[in-house]
Amino acid sequence: MRALSRKWVVRAVAALLVASSTAGCGFQLRGSNGSYTMPFHSIYLGFPDTSALGTELKRNLRATGQVVIADKAADAEAQFVLLGETRNKAILSLNSLGRVREYLLTYTMSFTVRDAKGVELVPPTQISLRRNMAFDETQVLAKESEEALLYRDMQADLVQQIIRRLASMKPAT
């Protein structure tokens, strides 16, 4: 019994040392802090009103508490211009009968950011995310739900990448 409790104490101390050393070196889980300092106070987002990506980006920018989302481009310090947004589904592999076994889902968007004078703050940038999805024709409805979930996950990843890029941009001087 004594050896068992001693083992447990040694493991607990080792875990504590590992945790404190990773925290001490500045390591943080992605998104654990979530606070970004934006180089502007207001931004206009050039997304269609029905864009789910635009809605999620607005929600995340408002959550920072530092940025006002302008209704008109003329009222904003920065203008986010959506150049393109596409979703694609391609066959990745086939089984021995020639039926689809796997799909490759791709979510690509390109954008630029300009200041109020039209000066480019972020050059045209393209972000492309990919996910593999196994397919089983006996579970079509479940796979449709999985596909929608994967696209939502990629959309959330895109929003986080956009926010990090906005936070890292340098204002025009």
Please report, for each region that a protein language model flagged, where it lies by residue.
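Short acidic low-complexity segments
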Residues: 66-77
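Soluble non-cytosolic domains of exported or imported proteins
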Residues: 47-55, 100, 104, 144-157
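Sec/Tat-exported extracytoplasmic proteins
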Residues: 61, 65, 113, 117, ...
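Alpha-helical transmembrane segments
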Residues: 12-16
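C-terminal/domain-edge helix-coil "capping" segments
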Residues: 141-173
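A structural "domain/chain start" motif
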Residues: 2-4, 8-11, 21-66, 171-173
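Short secondary-structure boundary/capping segments
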Residues: 34-36, 71-72, 119, 125
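Surface-exposed short loop/turn segments
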Residues: 81-126, 130-145
